[in-house]
């Protein structure tokens, strides 16, 4: 079952642009909600007429002890959250988790290391073995491990890494209020190295960190003017964590997530727009609106690094209610 009604005409050609202005994007973000949803739907139907949704599972391989001072993150050594530092899993343990994710229906397995940059030596060799193993299971492999060198990117490409996640987090203008230990340019250069190695990038941001609407438009402008667009664009809602500088912020209005997803879909028609952190707080109805607005991937599994995520059972019910197309045969 899908939501697609064959009697509703859809636009067959979608123009892909890389020259969006800040004013254009802000105007899209501020459109009346129904008009914004209609425009995003028109694009989404054209590029994804079967409403296919990718299920991506995310495992924290190395948790805590990160030298970055990201204001939102429970894993930073500068914050006083109660996250327990966890040593690197061995390769076998990670691949067992990947097998379980595949058995539950995931088709992409993402692995995260709480590092400022990838560490050469035994940790990096283990990372390469994990990527090889995930690929041998028939899953797409994604890694997030901070900054990396050209040589490290090349070796990850050699073992078949599909995507490297390195988020921009927020706009260039708001960035210094959130992070001081890594520059925006550092992030852009990391993405450049990944692309030069032939690996696709997974790159998005977080809303609800005290930014303005103009900041959100500015973040989207950076992403939408990358040529080519990121393969995946994760859209996160801040989950305030006790012990972090942003612990007292309120959860973002769910309709702001809908707007962000819809605008990302319009700007980057062929990218995967991934509903990421904060889904549990959004609720079922807002998540379905996000799927309607153009989200075509979710992070799937009971935890998302160090924050909770909807249960697999809840997500199966959500996706069935929405009528989107998922490879359910992986389960049954």
Curated annotation (Swiss-Prot):
Keywords: 2Fe-2S, 4Fe-4S, Biotin biosynthesis, Iron, Iron-sulfur, Metal-binding, S-adenosyl-L-methionine, Transferase. Homodimer. It comes from the Bacteria. Signal peptide: none annotated. Catalyzes the conversion of dethiobiotin (DTB) to biotin by the insertion of a sulfur atom into dethiobiotin via a radical-based mechanism. GO terms for molecular function: 2 iron, 2 sulfur cluster binding; 4 iron, 4 sulfur cluster binding; biotin synthase activity; iron ion binding. [2Fe-2S] cluster binds at residues 110, 142, 202, 274. Its EC number is 2.8.1.6. InterPro entries: Aldolase_TIM, BATS_dom, Biotin_synth/BioAB, Biotin_synthase, Elp3/MiaA/NifB-like_rSAM, rSAM. Binds 1 [4Fe-4S] cluster. The cluster is coordinated with 3 cysteines and an exchangeable S-adenosyl-L-methionine. Binds 1 [2Fe-2S] cluster. The cluster is coordinated with 3 cysteines and 1 arginine. Its cofactor is [4Fe-4S] cluster; [2Fe-2S] cluster. Belongs to the radical SAM superfamily. Biotin synthase family. One of its GO terms (biological process) is biotin biosynthetic process. Pathway: Cofactor biosynthesis; biotin biosynthesis; biotin from 7,8-diaminononanoate: step 2/2. This is Biotin synthase.
